[in-house]
A protein has these predicted regions:
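Glycine-rich adenosine-cofactor-binding loop
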Residues: 12, 21-41
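Phosphate-coordination loops involved in phosphoryl transfer and adenosine-cofactor binding
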Residues: 20-22, 45, 114-115
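Rossmann-like adenosine-cofactor binding region
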Residues: 71-118
């Protein structure tokens, strides 16, 4: 059984985070990201921006969510993300960055001071 979906949904509920009609930025394309996207879609998100250092991995995750050439997922190139991040309500770190003590996510979070960062 996939516990990632249950765990992510519970973390949203426990922290009283409503994602309905929100714009979400997901950093990374690791295994957990697919579960997160599934839950976000079932909860009615407006748009998901997905960025990964390897763009093709993000595109592969986006593909199942394309319908009539439209998708709630927009892939953002990592370099563009660092220069001009999209305006979002919530940021989710799906990368391995942050697991080690000295890890730094190279994103300017000042733009997101009042946003939810997970």
């Amino acid at each position: 059984a996939n516990t990632d979906t249950t765990g992510f949904l519970q973390s949203l509920q426990v922290n009283d985070i409503n994602v309905k009609n929100k714009n979400i930025l997901i950093l990374g394309s690791g295994g957990v990201v697919q579960s997160i996207i599934f839950i976000l879609k079932t909860q009615g998100v407006k748009k998901i921006y997905l960025s990964n250092r390897t763009k093709s991995k993000a595109e592969d995750i986006r593909l199942p969510y394309v319908n009539n050439n439209k998708s709630i997922i927009e892939v953002v190139e990592w370099a563009k993300l660092l220069k001009d991040p999209p305006d979002v309500d919530i940021i989710i770190n799906g990368t391995s960055l942050g697991l080690k003590k000295d890890d730094v996510i190279p994103l300017n979070f000042k733009k997101y001071e009042k946003k939810n960062i997970l």
